[in-house]
UniProtKB/Swiss-Prot annotation:
It catalyses: Endonucleolytic cleavage of RNA, removing extra 3' nucleotides from tRNA precursor, generating 3' termini of tRNAs. A 3'-hydroxy group is left at the tRNA terminus and a 5'-phosphoryl group is left at the trailer molecule. Its cofactor is Zn(2+). This is Ribonuclease Z. Zn(2+) 2 binds at D67, H68, D211, H269. The gene is rnz.
Amino acid sequence: MEVTFFGTSAGLPTKERNTQSIALNLEPYSNSIWLFDVGEGTQHQILRHSIKLGKIDHIFITHMHGDHIFGLPGLLTSRSFQGGENKPLTIIGPKGIQNYIETSLQLSESHLNYPITYIEINQQLAYHHNGFTVQAEMLNHGIPSFGYRIEAPITPGTINVEALRGIGLEPGPKYQEVKLQETFEYKGLIYNSDDFKGKAKPGPIISIFGDTKPCENEYELAKNSDLMIHEATYIEGDKKLANNYHHSHIDDVFNLIKQANVNKSLITHISNRYNIDEVTSIYNELSLDQTSPHFYFVKDFDTFKI
């Protein structure tokens, strides 16, 4: 799996940063792409990347502020002509997302050639798809804003060929049953599959946050994440200012990383008040502090393996 950032700015675009959008490539579990937020200009950013709109089969919206949704109507329309024909799309987000999209398409007389399934979140959501589990919880941003916890499928343990041969079962189609099922039958006997394969490997856990100031649900979403993607609109200065606007300060994110035992953290949604050089300087200063956790300020088009 890997994650690519198509927009990393907060509120307004800058010359270096587009507004928010994150792509999650599900390979090797699936050849699908999941998109988180679609700020204005997202489809133009995607044109500069190898990702194709037709491979996007889920879009998750964190909240209804414009820097997270203004790119939706154009991207959805273009998907019809860029490999998305007859390919179903699921859009998950706060209440109002369906009305926003359908009204935009209706008023612009835009027509799609694929079906959309809408799932609007009230307070929380548990969603399952092709072995993936997605948990959504309400954050604290002044309007409904959600964070998503994505747990990838468990990879079954490797088949122990010698152990299976020990009961007389040679390699063949039956091995797939041993690999995927809890028990299997052979010559009238029922066997426990775990006795004939190695330990299953849990898939990575990724937590992706919408805009928020610190709140209780953050911990539940972030705990033991292999990768956390979080906003830090304010990366220096007065923390009270960030929280007054229902946003996070970098110190808030650091506290969450430590409390939730996060392995790796990528920081996005950086205020347009900071240019690239200033972000680099602040990053270098924070990195020198030995109490700082593992983190990175992302830029547009950054891609990270998970």
